[in-house]
A protein has these predicted regions:
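Basic, polar low-complexity surface loops/patches
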Residues: 1-90
Length: 90
């Protein structure tokens, strides 16, 4: 598991009942079961990275997607990025 995914997993443990919007650059990414559910609910493209389901929304449009999920009864947790993303994804 990459350092980035370790960080995601640790944060997701704290917010297991929420959809975790995980900021990476100009996007909020969702992974694993969150990605599968959100892609279905919002009709987003579900992709995979190293067998990990993922989907994302642009930061500048995130309020629209978050509002839609809240209207559907979902709880949201937002994790902002601090610092730069390393080339190795960590």
């Amino acid at each position: 598991m990459t350092p980035l995914m370790e960080q995601y997993a640790n944060i997701k443990k704290q917010y297991a009942d929420e959809v975790l919007f995980f900021r990476l650059g100009d996007f909020y990414e969702m992974f694993n079961e969150d990605a599968v559910e959100v892609s279905r609910l919002l009709n987003l493209t579900l992709t995979h990275r190293a067998d990990c389901p993922m989907c994302g929304v642009p930061y500048h449009a995130s309020k629209i997607y978050i509002a839609r999920l809240l209207r559907l009864g979902k709880k949201i947790a937002i994790c902002e990025q601090v610092g730069e993303i390393s080339p190795g994804g960590g």
